[in-house]
Design a protein with these regions (language model features):
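Membrane-proximal, non-transmembrane alpha-helical segments
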Residues: 82-97
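Membrane-inserting effector segments that mediate pore formation, membrane fusion
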Residues: 94-142
Length: 144
């Protein structure tokens, strides 16, 4: 499992996505403040419904764009998986099938937690972070 180091392109995409997410957070906080605290001398709320709706839509779009950049960065990380890619796809498919059939909520929580850990490891592009989540998910899938 030799993954290449994270590229500067991948890091740049993640940094931009982080910035867009932070901007969306700031927009949300400012919008909520405007809704709760009207301008001096104005009646509540301090923003019209149309303006609030437009700003909420902008917040959602910022988050969608950030998520798209995170996805692009993860795609770059996944491209370097080489031969592991098929093993990861197979294991993810097995996990998906188990998710469909699981009866116990605690097993569902544990399985999805392992799957999320593996997804995070893949997105990180760090080979040392991939082995443990892969093995844990594989063991969990086999135990169900």
């Amino acid at each position: 499992m030799n993954l290449p180091p994270r590229s500067s392109t991948q890091l740049d995409l993640e940094a931009l996505a982080d910035s867009l997410s932070a901007s969306a957070d700031a927009l949300h906080a400012r919008l909520m403040r405007a809704i709760r605290q009207p301008a001096p001398g104005a009646n509540p709320p301090g923003i019209s419904q149309a303006a609030a709706q437009a700003l909420f839509e902008n917040e959602v779009i910022l988050r969608q764009r950030a998520n798209g950049l995170y996805l692009e960065a993860a795609t770059l990380a996944a491209a370097g998986l080489g031969g592991m890619q098929q093993q990861l796809l197979d294991l993810a498919a097995q996990a998906q099938e188990k998710i469909r059939k699981i009866d116990k909520i605690k097993d569902l929580i544990a399985l999805t937690g392992e799957l999320l850990s593996l997804a995070a490891a893949v997105a990180s592009g760090a080979p040392e972070k991939l082995v443990a989540p892969y093995e844990k998910l594989k063991a969990r899938v086999e135990s169900l």
